[in-house]
């Protein structure tokens, strides 16, 4: 099952992954916990190369694509027609920060998640921009939505945004 699309500052065979955070699109019901939001997929409906990854998420009847660049990655989510399409950003534990900026269709933040071997002040910053306005936006801590806030810093935080989508 596909639980998320994980982004890393640097995968390393010597000190493991560090600076990782994840992005997961979904439809129907918002699910923040990575195990409950997981979707079935088939390797037959997956394409993986060093420069492109695509997978059909059968649980949500949608396709997710990622194309990495030297400094960032481009995502494309092909949703079905839905009034409840979401994207969850998980900045993981060990200290993280997120801020949703609805007027700019943007989420910014950082993660300090690592497996050791990095400086004490290590942070991997991210900026996520969307090409559609949000119809829903929340932040969460320890898998619980936090009301009345669009910015949060704690051990384990994330953001959830929603859209109304047309097919394709």
Regions found by a protein language model. Give the residues of each.
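Accessory carbohydrate-recognition regions in carbohydrate-active enzymes
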Residues: 1-4, 8-167
């Amino acid at each position: 099952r596909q639980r998320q699309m994980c982004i890393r500052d640097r995968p390393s065979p010597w000190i493991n992954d560090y600076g990782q955070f994840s992005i997961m699109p979904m439809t129907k019901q918002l699910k923040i916990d990575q195990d409950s939001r997981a979707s079935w997929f088939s390797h037959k409906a997956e394409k993986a190369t060093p420069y492109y990854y695509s997978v059909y998420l059968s649980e949500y009847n949608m396709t997710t694509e990622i194309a990495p660049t030297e400094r960032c990655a481009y995502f494309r989510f092909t949703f079905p027609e839905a009034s409840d399409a979401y994207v969850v950003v998980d900045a993981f534990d060990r200290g993280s920060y997120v801020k949703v900026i609805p007027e700019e269709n943007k989420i910014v933040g950082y993660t300090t998640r690592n497996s050791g071997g990095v400086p004490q002040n290590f942070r991997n910053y991210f900026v996520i921009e969307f090409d559609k306005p949000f119809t829903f936006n929340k932040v969460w801590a320890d898998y619980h939505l936090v009301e009345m806030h669009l910015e949060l810093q704690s051990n384990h935080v994330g953001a959830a945004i929603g859209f109304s989508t047309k097919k394709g």
